Design a protein with these regions (language model features):
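An N-terminal assembly and electron-transfer interface module characteristic of large anaerobic redox
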Residues: 1-140
Length: 140
């Protein structure tokens, strides 16, 4: 898919790989593993996940965020609109994509590609407009 190989479109983070790394006593490895589970953003309320996502997006300088809603995951799907509102209040555009992360036969690849392409185009337009505004302010 051509969307995966665009220079201007890069994945800068994934909430599943962003884990809590608390200080721990090497003599208590099970306690350390338990802390990683308990304090991970996906363990807890939806607002905890949303706030962690906003923090990660800001830390990485992301231009936008894709919120993938796994079919059948009430936690993810139920929080999608709240996430959209919270991210956008922080100036971070968010695209909600629903799909089946386990079974590709459920399809939707064409629609997903179209929606992702439109989102990337919108982000590119916003970036270009911001660059133009910055150049205009420097010219004055």
């Amino acid at each position: 898919n051509e969307l995966c190989f665009q220079e201007k479109a890069q994945i800068v983070g994934c909430e599943l790989s962003h884990v809590c790394e608390p200080d721990f006593d090497p003599e208590k490895p099970y306690e350390a593993m338990a802390r990683r589970m308990v304090y991970h953003a996906l363990n807890g309320s939806a607002i905890r996940r949303i706030e962690a996502g906003i923090r990660h997006a800001k830390e990485t300088g992301a231009d936008g965020v894709v919120w993938f809603g796994h079919w059948g995951c009430k936690h993810t799907l139920g929080a999608a609109q709240l996430a959209k509102r919270k991210f956008e209040e922080q100036g971070i555009p968010l695209l909600i994509l629903d799909g089946d992360g386990c079974d590709r036969s459920h399809g939707g690849e064409g629609q997903t590609s179209t929606r992702l392409g439109a989102f990337l185009e919108m982000l590119n337009t916003e970036t270009d407009e911001n660059t133009d505004r910055q150049e205009e302010s420097h010219d004055e």
